[in-house]
């Protein structure tokens, strides 16, 4: 996994040249947006437990057979494994968002995930649906579109840097889409 700074150095080194003005301008922009990026990651990690449990609950509500005898969320140990997997996926998405690079997600989370789920008999459609629900929740937290009306008793207002976060919302959404594509 290379962060934005390391990528610039590696690229310049491969060309046997100094870091160029275009790279420096891109790094300045990256630093300027740094607080928003940190706030976005904080919004995900501070709400990770709720994001994951709500996603698994939503997946089960749409497919109640998952919690019946023989279902992939029955008995409790399988439910715990499902919640654990959701937390791991969300954690690697937060790493990718922090670094601004999907390689950590690809290398350490998605590589072989589909094959593992197939071997374990995990229904790909249900797993992808849970990730889609996590995507909706996480992007709402990042974009501050989560409101008291939507969250009810679970609503929690986060202190965040002011400004447009639409680029970070789109970036985070792309990481969730990578996971969905890898599973499906």
Swiss-Prot record:
It is a peripheral membrane protein. This is C-phycoerythrin class 1 subunit beta. It comes from the Bacteria. The lineage of its organism: Bacteria, Bacillati, Cyanobacteriota, Cyanophyceae, Synechococcales. It comes from Synechococcus sp. (strain WH7803). Signal peptide: none annotated. InterPro entries: Globin-like_sf (IPR009050), Phycobilisome_asu/bsu (IPR012128), Phycobilisome_asu/bsu_sf (IPR038719). Pfam families: Phycobilisome (PF00502). Light-harvesting photosynthetic bile pigment-protein from the phycobiliprotein complex.
């Amino acid at each position: 996994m290379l962060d934005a700074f390391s990528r610039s150095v590696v690229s310049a080194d491969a060309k046997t040249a100094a870091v160029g003005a275009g790279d420096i301008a891109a790094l300045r922009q990256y630093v300027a947006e740094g607080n928003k990026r940190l706030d976005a990651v904080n919004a995900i990690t501070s709400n990770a437990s709720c994001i994951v449990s709500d996603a698994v609950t939503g997946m089960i509500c749409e497919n109640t057979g998952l919690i019946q005898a023989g279902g992939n969320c029955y008995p409790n140990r399988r439910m715990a494994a499902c919640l654990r997997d959701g937390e791991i996926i969300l954690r690697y998405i937060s790493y990718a968002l922090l670094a601004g690079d999907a390689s950590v997600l690809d290398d350490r989370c998605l590589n072989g995930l589909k094959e593992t789920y197939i071997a374990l008999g995990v229904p790909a459609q249900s797993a992808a649906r849970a990730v889609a629900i996590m995507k909706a929740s996480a992007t709402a937290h990042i974009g501050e579109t989560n409101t008291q009306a939507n969250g009810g008793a679970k609503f929690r207002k986060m202190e965040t840097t002011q400004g447009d976060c639409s680029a970070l919302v789109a970036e985070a959404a792309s990481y969730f889409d990578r996971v969905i594509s890898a599973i499906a």
